[in-house]
Amino acid sequence: CILLQTRADDKYALAEEMNSFYKHQLNINTWGGPLNILECTPKGVHKAFALEYLLNVMNIDKQNLIAFGDEHNDQEMLSFAGKGYAMKNANPALLPFADEQLPLTNEEDGVAQFLQERFL
């Protein structure tokens, strides 16, 4: 994975342009809020890829996996998990990939609150 911080006014347009050029070799996603981060990974390598590997090694069914996300680079992970949750501050493009949207943001400790309410 390579992370690039860009000065581009529109990181989404830049990512789209780069994806069209490198579409057979790389996945290019955006994240970082105001930081304008582009995440470049080899085609087919993403968070769900890593989670699938770990689940296989640990002999855990993916239905027992919950995932939390807020940006484009979380799409595959939320789709892959048994339950995928988008944060309140999630990029709207991520919402179709989530089973549910949490009522709190990252900054409001939304994941910790969710885990405490559900499991403690």
Residue ranges and their predicted role:
Residues 1-66, 72-75:
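Conserved acidic, metal-coordinating active-site core of Asp-based
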Residues 41-120:
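Mg2+-dependent phosphoryl-transfer enzymes with acidic/Ser/Thr/Gly-rich catalytic loops
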